[in-house]
């Protein structure tokens, strides 16, 4: 079931901005390989997103160090994976296939976490929860580095539970278990920086249990110290790059928290881990019904889970494993709030970041709801229904909705089209490419000329207008769509010239804004004397 839900309709949704960024670096390219400040036909996108052979992980890491804010291991793995698929066929599905595969593997690992922590039956319950979670399936269908770190965090929890049981149940230390725990956490740091939060939470949880139980065995503390030191030394080669990445402009897009908004946004995110019914782009009545139903289900599930947790904490056989998973999950959530209010960046507005603690959440949910009457079967049922909605693009819709933007661009398919994107950074370029890819899917069999262009607008938008006026002669009529982040509706000029021969007038009825504004201009030949 987990595999089916993750691979079903894998290429149905168009790539969005972040997935385009994944594609660029995973194909062995960088932003300097993109055709900027010139007009090119939409068909050139096939060449832009082609695999560049002969690259090493060192090359990819160098590209990421200079042009991105991510560690290299996921992208190196993706580059190797895509190399096995040469020549690329359905490249969007192939790009998303490996993250989906990591998502399936996480189902197996979370089974072992709860099997070792509790029992085989509880392990199967955790696997079932992970398999049908709309949140986990959503992450698995993204060509992004979320399922691989989630897999590694699940593995780290597996070894953490083993360590906890060795210390408090068997009074022993197995060096290989500690070594595996350290290795898995080290690898995770080279996959996603947020795995640092997971590592800190694991250390805090283990240290808290040791202090609570007044563990004075010197060998335990030495082993923990050596393990942490080994992780730190192993990550040191990339540490300075991480500090450089933390200061880049790409990390500044998150807004400051609005009072207690992060609190209720966190609760909403927990509900979305269990149930996601359509509310986006829906009639108000349908959205309201879905929202109320999700809220009622969420309240019921949380109430039953709390009752189950209380019983687990009272039972000596399950107390330590429950505390280990609960401590890890709670610690990460507290770290999130520390980041939000200390750095003034509200990360709760981005549900996908909850991948850091989702393995712990899923494991706790399964063990606390199992045996609580109809609650556990209900979680599985609403999860399956939610995943069906997800696979038909009714929930967890792609940011900036590239498929909707492409349909708006293509309202007059028989008229030649030019899409011009004003960019101030490479994220604007990636966003424009996502629109182009969605448009290419619509126009794959069309003979009507469709062109795309990216022009630098760092100084001001007038620079884009000037470059359009300097273009070579274009055929008329022409529909010109101008995409300009940060531009208000009234700031779009009434008329734009494309080359010296076409005059383009703004169509007041064709202004849209889906996270970013875009405006239609209708171009005709200028009158000549």
Model-derived features: positions:
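Membrane-interface helix-loop-helix junctions at transmembrane boundaries of multi-pass membrane enzymes
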Residues: 111, 115-116, 171-172, 210-225, ...
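Catalytic lumenal/periplasmic loop and adjoining terminal transmembrane helix
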Residues: 371-516
């Amino acid at each position: 079931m987990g595999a089916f839900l993750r691979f079903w309709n894998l290429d149905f949704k168009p790539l969005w901005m972040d997935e385009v960024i994944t594609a660029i670096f995973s194909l062995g390219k960088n932003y300097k390989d993109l055709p900027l400040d010139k007009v090119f036909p939409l068909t050139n996108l096939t060449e832009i997103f082609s695999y560049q052979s002969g690259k090493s992980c060192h090359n990819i890491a160098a590209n990421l160090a200079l042009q991105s804010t991510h560690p290299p291991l996921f992208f190196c793995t993706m580059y190797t994976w895509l190399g096995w698929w040469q020549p690329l066929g359905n490249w969007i599905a192939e790009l998303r296939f490996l993250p989906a595969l990591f998502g399936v593997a996480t189902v197996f690992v979370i089974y072992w976490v709860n099997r070792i922590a509790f029992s085989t039956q509880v392990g199967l319950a955790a696997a079932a929860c992970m398999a049908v979670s709309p949140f986990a399936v959503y992450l698995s269908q993204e060509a992004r580095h979320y399922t691989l770190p989630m897999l590694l965090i699940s593995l780290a929890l597996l070894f953490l539970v083993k360590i906890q049981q060795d210390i408090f149940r068997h009074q022993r230390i197995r060096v290989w278990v500690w070594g595996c725990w350290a290795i898995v956490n080290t690898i995770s740091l080279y996959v996603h920086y947020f795995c640092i939060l997971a590592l800190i939470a694991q250390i805090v949880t283990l240290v808290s249990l040791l202090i609570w139980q007044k563990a004075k065995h010197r060998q335990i503390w030495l082993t923990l110290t050596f393990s942490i030191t080994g992780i730190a030394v192993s990550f040191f080669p990339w540490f300075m790059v991480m500090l450089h990445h933390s200061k880049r402009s790409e990390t500044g897009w998150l807004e400051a928290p609005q009072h207690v908004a992060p609190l209720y946004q966190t609760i909403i995110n927990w509900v979305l881990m269990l149930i996601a019914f359509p509310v986006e782009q829906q009639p108000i009545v349908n959205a309201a019904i879905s929202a109320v139903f999700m809220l009622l289900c969420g309240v019921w599930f949380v109430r039953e889970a709390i009752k189950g947790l209380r019983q687990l904490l009272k039972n000596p056989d399950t107390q330590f494993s429950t505390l280990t998973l609960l401590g890890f999950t709670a610690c990460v959530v507290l770290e999130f709030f520390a980041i939000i209010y200390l750095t003034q960046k509200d990360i709760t507005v981005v549900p996908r970041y909850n991948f850091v603690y989702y393995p712990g959440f899923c494991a706790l949910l399964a063990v606390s709801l199992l045996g609580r009457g109809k609650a556990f079967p209900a979680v599985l049922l609403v999860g399956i229904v939610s995943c069906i909605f997800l696979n038909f693009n009714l929930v967890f819709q792609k940011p900036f909705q590239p498929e909707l933007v492409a349909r708006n661009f293509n309202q007059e398919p028989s008229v030649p089209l030019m899409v011009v994107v004003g960019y101030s950074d490479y994220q604007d370029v990636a966003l424009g490419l996502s629109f182009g890819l969605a448009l290419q899917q619509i126009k794959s069999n069309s003979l009507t000329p469709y062109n795309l262009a990216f022009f630098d607008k760092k100084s001001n938008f007038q620079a884009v207008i000037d470059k359009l006026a300097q273009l070579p002669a274009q055929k008329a009529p022409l529909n010109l769509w101008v995409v300009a982040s940060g531009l208000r509706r009234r700031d779009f000029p009434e008329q734009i010239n494309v080359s010296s021969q076409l005059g383009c007038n703004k169509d007041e009825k064709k202004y849209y804004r889906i996270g970013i504004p875009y405006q239609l201009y209708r171009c005709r030949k200028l009158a000549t004397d």
